[in-house]
């Protein structure tokens, strides 16, 4: 590939990834539909909302096998299939007449489709820009976050004008077309050459090799903690506002806007910063910010200002962590197997999405979950300040040996 073609191909891949990520991020408008689906199915909102928990779990599971899918079929085909399955999932959701069908379509099918496209396109795009990994992650994951904001207005307008069932059909069609079009612009990133620095081989670890390193599980704990704290607070922010900060319904609803802005800010600020300083130090900064926010929720007298500041801190770290982590994992274990190595760590997203709710349901209230998250943040902070990269292999001068 000539230098000019290489540049053109990677920038087209970036554009396709941004379009695809924007459409995939639309699933985070799900809370808009809980009330209408509850009325349609004559089921409690909590049972309807469980479909989003299944979606998050399915997303994490399919992300963990995205690397193997890319190896066999290529990024373009897998992304197109992801878009088609996502559109099908929304179509089936529109025609769901019971909870089980809703859970299978909106939860399992949409989640699996979304996860396959999300991590695959992200890791492939990062490989095209090894010199700007943080910035490219910020662009890609930032567009995923913007998708929830953009489709919030689209879906709200559709609900008001065409009703619930047609909204799902149109939403699915728009997402399908965007993802398939984005996929046509993408190409698989070339395999990265093994680099050497001062006689040291920068090794590309396979998944099996990575999982034998303690650093892999240290990173996994940090990622799980950020996801658990962010997803739990995002899920119950409105309830915390009313129960603990004693805000009225209108003021409490502003928590969604605050979280969206903080989440996106974390993705952009920490993502760009990760190209300037050591990425693990960026994770440490995010952990400190989240720790301050969680401490405020636990120990500070909550009013509108302290509450919004606290949840903003947690959401900022969550957005920043999921942006920086793909590049961080590639820094520790190499770029060539990033989709596989990050895919297993990304299971922490699915596990974290349900852990907070399980703890809260077992012990009642918010505070026990907050204390668990607070303790995990302290542990994660200790890990991020002590972790070191795996030892690399030294090149020997002797002929034919390493």
Curated annotation (Swiss-Prot):
This is Uncharacterized MFS-type transporter YhjX. CDD domains: MFS_OFA_like (cd17353). It comes from the Bacteria. Gene3D superfamilies: MFS general substrate transporter like domains. It is a multi-pass membrane protein. Residues 1-11, 67-72, 123-134, 187-216, 274-279, 330-341, 388-402 are cytoplasmic. PANTHER family: MAJOR FACILITATOR SUPERFAMILY (MFS) PROFILE DOMAIN-CONTAINING PROTEIN-RELATED, MONOCARBOXYLATE TRANSPORTER. Induction: Induced by the two-component regulatory system YpdA/YpdB in response to pyruvate. Regulated at post-transcriptional level by CsrA. Part of a nutrient-sensing regulatory network composed of the two-component regulatory systems BtsS/BtsR and YpdA/YpdB, and their respective target proteins, BtsT and YhjX. It comes from Escherichia coli (strain K12).
């Amino acid at each position: 590939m000539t230098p000019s073609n290489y540049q053109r191909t990677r920038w087209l891949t970036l554009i396709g990834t941004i379009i695809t990520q924007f459409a995939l991020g639309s699933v985070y408008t799900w809370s808009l539909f809980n009330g209408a689906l509850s009325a349609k199915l004559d089921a409690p909102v909590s049972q309807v909302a469980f479909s989003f928990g299944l979606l998050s779990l399915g997303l994490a599971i399919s992300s963990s096998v995205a690397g193997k899918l890319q190896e066999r079929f290529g990024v373009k085909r897998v992304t197109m299939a992801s878009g088609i399955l996502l559109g099908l999932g929304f179509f089936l959701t529109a025609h769901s007449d019971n909870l089980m069908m809703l859970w299978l379509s909106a939860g399992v099918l949409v989640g699996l489709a979304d996860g396959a496209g999300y991590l695959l396109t992200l890791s492939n795009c990062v490989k095209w820009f090894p010199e700007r990994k943080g910035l490219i992650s910020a662009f890609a994951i930032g567009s995923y976050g913007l998708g929830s904001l953009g489709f919030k207005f689209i879906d709200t307008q559709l609900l008001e004008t065409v009703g619930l069932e047609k909204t799902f059909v149109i939403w699915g069609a728009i997402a399908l077309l965007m993802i398939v079009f984005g996929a046509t612009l993408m190409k698989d990133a070339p395999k990265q050459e093994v680099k050497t620095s001062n006689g040291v081989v920068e090794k590309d670890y396979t998944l099996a090799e990575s999982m034998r390193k303690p650093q892999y599980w240290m990173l996994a704990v940090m990622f799980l903690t950020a996801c658990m704290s962010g997803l739990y607070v995002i899920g119950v922010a409105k309830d915390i506002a009313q129960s603990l900060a004693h805000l009225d319904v209108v003021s409490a609803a502003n928590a969604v806007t605050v979280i969206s802005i903080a989440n996106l800010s974390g993705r952009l600020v920490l993502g760009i910063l990760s190209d300037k300083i050591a990425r693990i130090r960026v994770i440490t900064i995010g952990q400190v910010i989240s720790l301050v926010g969680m401490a405020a929720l636990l120990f500070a007298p909550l009013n509108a200002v302290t509450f919004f500041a606290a949840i903003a801190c947690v959401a900022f770290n969550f957005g920043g962590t999921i942006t920086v982590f793909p590049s961080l994992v590639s820094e520790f274990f190499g770029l060539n197997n990033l989709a596989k190595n990050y895919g297993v760590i990304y299971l922490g997203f699915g596990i974290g999405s349900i852990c907070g709710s399980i703890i809260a349901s077992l012990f009642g209230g918010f505070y026990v979950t907050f204390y668990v998250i607070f303790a995990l943040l302290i542990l994660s902070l200790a890990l991020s300040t002590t972790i070191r990269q795996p030892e690399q292999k030294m090149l020997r001068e002797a002929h034919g040996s390493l």
